[in-house]
UniProtKB/Swiss-Prot annotation:
Pfam families: PapZ_C, RapZ-like_N. One of its GO terms (molecular function) is ATP binding. It comes from Lactococcus lactis subsp. cremoris (strain SK11). It comes from the Bacteria. Displays ATPase and GTPase activities. Keywords: ATP-binding, GTP-binding, Nucleotide-binding. ATP binds at residues 12-19. The keyword Manganese does not apply. Belongs to the RapZ-like family. GTP binds at residues 63-66. This is Nucleotide-binding protein LACR_1047.
Amino acid sequence: MDNKLNIVIITGMSGAGKTVAIQSFEDMGYFTVDNMPPNLIEKFVGLLNTPDNKIDKVALVVDMRSRAFFEDIQSIVTELTDNTSVNFKLLFLDANDTELVSRYKETRRSHPLAIDGRTLDGITKEREILADLKNLSEVVIDTSELTPRNLRARILQKFATSTESTFRIEVMSFGFKYGLPLDADLVFDVRFLPNPHYISELRDKNGTDQEVYDYVMEHPQSEEFYQNLMKMLVPILPAYKKEGKSVLTIAFGCTGGQHRSVAFAERVSAALREKWHLNVSHRDKDRRKETVNRS
């Protein structure tokens, strides 16, 4: 098993997509640092490259914002390439001049090397400075025709080490009376199912308790809904992954988030966990109990 520290330096033309790139690495579980001064990289790597360090993947953005320090980058890249105690890759992001000018016009920002606001002059100068560094890069991606989503997918394709690190599913339950979860991608309302709240011996239990789970699932409409739901979910999950989505949140809601939604979140997560990296949570499961305790 390779226990070496994995280091990726992200560099390239200003406006070529380094922000999207570093976010992509963060989604893959990398420790990320934006705008890292090149003269600090050696010391930073030394701090991480120790037996008791728990960080095993690092992605650093180094670009022309470092200005005076940038001249150190080539020698540092050479040192990291020759360092047998780390796994090192250099990622260079590029785009054609027309596209870069267009992106700067769209964002209304100034190129770091532009003189008197002349963006194209700044791009030309930067391209000359980075020419040797581009030649040293193990991975070069031209983003001229790529959307942010396409770029993210390309990076995942080239750098991801496992399916678990590139796509995961969050299944959650919630109560509509406490509001919709803001981060949910898919929301399913299960308030049409019989409510255990009206069964006295089930009222103070929740959907993780076997009695409540069985009560919810024993009704024919529960089984019909579950079967139809899985027929929909199974084919669309690979499509979400293919589009480069890192987290898909599937939420089930009932009135208070204690019984029906919890039971369904448990059942669906158990089925999907066989194939997908998945986490299940119950936002409002204990909210009623907490309210009673505070009163």
